[in-house]
Amino acid sequence: VFYSVARTERSTDTCANTACDRSACPCCGHLLTFDYYHYHHIGKARCPHCGFALPEAVFQAAEVDFDHCRFTLRELGQAELSLPFRGGNLFGVFNTAAAVGCCRMLGLAGADIARAIEEPELQTGRFESRKAGELEIVTMLSKNQNPISSTQSIAYLSHVPGKKTVVLTITDSLDKVHGHEDISWLYDTDFDALRDESVETVYIGGRRCYDLALRLILSGVAQEKLQLFPDYGELEQALIRQAPTEGTVAIFFELYAKPIAMGLR
């Protein structure tokens, strides 16, 4: 059983990302043709040489409304469902469509699933948003050493209106336990959204803040935007002193840095 996401307003005709891994047909090795890309190598692909194509989806997410975080789930032979998703990005659509499809395969009624999704008591997770007066504070997981996850998290900023302050704690927060020396993944990650003039300040925390700062500068982010803090305590104090009172503060954190991100929030 397969599921998919139809073309959205954010889909592109060519790969818009630095990393686009799956370009060859898994059957014959010739180049794939994409009807559209969602991000990186995720989209609707087919092979003009041997006829390979993605299988027909039993469940398809369509009519994605990013502004209101809703989409329509179409199931072969069944009534359509209007469903919400979290996070404001396509990850939320894929995750919700997969979960609902699984529930349908287990025999749950579509109406019951939709009602349960509309009324959950959500636990803290990879995306949270809350208001403090005129200021919106967003925390979002950006998986360490995963350029696709990191690119999609950073791209969220492109669709956030108004002035933005960004906090990056996406490199090794626990070097002594889960340490590594590989920073090549930073160069497969797209940081284009940070170049926008609406992003006023970028705080970078952690022992690898200088590596990340160099990557941002090489990608065209203005150096004067950057504030570097190898020590997370100093980063927290700087945020307390300089935090804006309106707009958006977006805190991106790697897998092991969630306690740090929650403290900064």
State where each predicted segment sits.
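Generic structural motif
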Residues: 8, 64, 76-78, 88, ...
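ATP-dependent carboxylate-amine ligase
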Residues: 19-22, 29-32, 39-54, 101-110, ...
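Extended acidic/charged loop-beta regions that coordinate divalent cations
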Residues: 1-84
